């Protein structure tokens, strides 16, 4: 081993674990994400996805999620909103399709050709999480879903989104609803079985309340259901 390699190994052995996770992050993309997120959240998210793609943190997340979803290895989620819209309005697929169509959303908006199977499942999972966790696409709902997802994934993207919570608390009308939604979303995410391991493509026709029960979060919706 050369002196340079020895020095690198020595530095890594003494590196803070949190610093090690940040290795490989594209900080230019992070800066761009912060510059545009409030004006254009979708563009900000795309910047963060690019920022984390080659990071050790994201590799750790992907390996852990792939392990949780090992029974689905190699499977991607194919979504046909036209067909799903024909399902009853109380089903997972029916509610998801109506959510997407009403907001004019593209299920593949955050997926890229470079994604492997687990990355594709997580890329299309955001709005599925909205439906399962019961949150709309309002700012409060988005923060709550980010908290739910962070508890499941422990990823950079949702850390980034939640970093805007303190700024949002400056709006007095949001303070208590926002804090309550974020805490509830995080607790629900910790309680839920891994949603990434749930074969949504096999359960579109299932009533949403049964999906929630199978994931272990049905009790959060007793009054709603």
What residues fall within each predicted segment?
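The feature captures two recurrent sequence modes
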Residues: 1-82
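Long, solvent-exposed, polar/charged low-complexity segments
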Residues: 2-8, 12, 16-23, 29, ...
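Core of folded catalytic or high-affinity ligand/protein-binding domains
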Residues: 63-213
């Amino acid at each position: 081993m050369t002196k340079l390699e020895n020095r690198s190994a020595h530095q890594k052995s003494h590196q803070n674990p949190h610093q090690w996770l940040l290795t490989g992050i594209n900080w230019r993309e992070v800066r761009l994400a912060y510059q545009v997120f409030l004006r254009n959240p979708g563009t900000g998210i795309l910047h963060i996805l690019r920022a984390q793609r080659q990071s050790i943190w994201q590799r750790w997340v992907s390996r852990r999620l792939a392990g949780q979803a090992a029974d689905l290895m190699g499977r991607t989620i194919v979504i046909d909103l036209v067909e799903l819209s024909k399902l009853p309005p109380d089903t997972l697929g029916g509610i998801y399709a109506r959510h997407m169509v009403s907001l004019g959303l593209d299920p593949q908006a955050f997926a890229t050709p470079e994604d492997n199977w687990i990355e594709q499942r997580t890329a299309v999972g955001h709005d599925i999480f909205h439906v399962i966790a019961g949150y709309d696409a309002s700012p409060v709902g988005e923060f709550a879903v980010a908290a739910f997802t962070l508890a499941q994934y422990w990823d950079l993207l949702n850390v980034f989104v939640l970093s805007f919570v303190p700024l949002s608390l400056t709006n007095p009308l949001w303070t208590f609803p926002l804090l309550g939604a974020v805490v509830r979303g995080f607790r629900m995410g910790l309680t839920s079985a891994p949603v990434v391991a749930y074969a949504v493509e096999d359960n579109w026709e299932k009533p949403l309340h049964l999906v929630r029960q199978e994931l272990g979060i049905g009790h959060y919706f007793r009054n709603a259901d």
